[in-house]
Amino acid sequence: MTWHEVNDVIVITLPEIFDMNANLGYLTREKNECMYEIENNIITKVIAIGEIRSLVQVSVINNKQMIVQFLNDSRPVEQWKREEIVKYIHEWFDLDNDLTPFYEMAKADPLLKMPARKFYGLRVIGIPDLFEALCWGVLGQQINLAFAYSLKKQFVEAFGDSIEWNGKKYWVFPPYERIARLTPTDLADIKMTVKKSEYIIGIARLMASGELSREKLMKMNFKDAEKNLIKIRGIGPWTANYVLMRCLRFPTAFPIDDVGLIHSIKILRNMNRKPTKDEILEISVPWKEWQSYATFYLWRVLY
């Protein structure tokens, strides 16, 4: 991580392959997003690291430097806490990943060459917090994206914390410790199924007990991490791979049964039917070690 501070503002040096407009195109796709606000190409968000609650504005200069400005007197005094915030931002935008091999592969790939050219500099936007990533995966199961965002907003505003600034509330995702103490009845006002409520509370309790953690999963290889996630009630292969991709940063994560992925392939290949799983496996052979990026770019084609 290369960064420094100027007058209490954090300045992060960006990798060569980075385009803020491409990333904002992804981040602004849903008006119901409750975890950040974007105005004039500036992201305002609360970054929570343990008990740290920092309200920051993130902007970019010439795709070379990322500027992180603290609002509302929320700049941590201790340098190690500011380092954790920089680390969070690196994970959020996947800044430590050299995308050169991905683009070398994509420019020769019949399916990826168009999205790789059109969305050059797009990163797989992450969800660094494991509980948030798992909840988002569960909330999105078998419903459309707009309704999933609505459920997330209800959940966050019912059980999360917030920082108020300039008359607006900026939200922190509910901590697993808080959700672990609830019952499905407590979530009844949120228009999710009882099953989803049970799944989310169950995940929170596994994390509260220490049985499940990001640190433990990160020490595993891909297959073991996938198996450990799938054995959790409410987590199937799709959700597991979504979390492996967006939180744990396994490059081979591949939600092969994803509806959006299937639809994107159908569009780009001008098919009059859905591609089969075997066809997708064959198409994806050149994507080895970059399946997560290939998936993310194919999703991006859809909006």
Curated annotation (Swiss-Prot):
Coiled coil: none
One Gene Ontology CC term in the entry: cytoplasm
SUPFAM superfamilies per UniProt: DNA-glycosylase (SSF48150), TATA-box binding protein-like (SSF55945)
GO molecular function terms attached to this record: alkylated DNA binding; DNA-3-methyladenine glycosylase activity; DNA-7-methylguanine glycosylase activity; oxidized purine nucleobase lesion DNA N-glycosylase activity
Domain of life from the UniProt record: Bacteria
Active site (record annotation): D258 (proton acceptor)
Keywords (A to Z) from UniProt: DNA damage, DNA repair, Hydrolase
Enzyme Commission identifier(s): 3.2.2.21
Catalytic activity: Hydrolysis of alkylated DNA, releasing 3-methyladenine, 3-methylguanine, 7-methylguanine and 7-methyladenine
One of the protein's GO biological processes: base-excision repair, AP site formation
The protein's enzyme class: hydrolase
Induction of the gene: Up-regulated by methylated AdaA in response to the exposure to alkylating agents.
Observed effect of gene inactivation: Disruption of this gene sensitizes cells to the alkylating agent N-propyl-N'-nitro-N-nitrosoguanidine.
InterPro entries: AlkA_N_sf, Alkylbase_DNA_Glycosylase/TA, Alkylbase_DNA_glycsylse_CS, DNA_glycosylase, HhH-GPD_domain, HhH_base_excis_C, OGG_N
Keyword Cytoplasm: no
Alphabetized Pfam families for the sequence: HhH-GPD (PF00730), OGG_N (PF07934)
Site label Determinant for substrate specificity and/or activity, positions: W238
Further details from the record: Overproduction of this gene renders cells highly resistant to the alkylating agent N-propyl-N'-nitro-N-nitrosoguanidine.
PANTHER family registered for this protein in UniProt: DNA-3-METHYLADENINE GLYCOSYLASE
Family stated for the protein in its record: Belongs to the alkylbase DNA glycosidase AlkA family.
Job of this protein: Is involved in the adaptive response to alkylation damage in DNA caused by alkylating agents. Catalyzes the hydrolysis of the deoxyribose N-glycosidic bond to excise 3-methyladenine and 7-methylguanine from the damaged DNA polymer formed by alkylation lesions.
Protein name as annotated: DNA-3-methyladenine glycosylase
Native organism: Bacillus subtilis (strain 168)
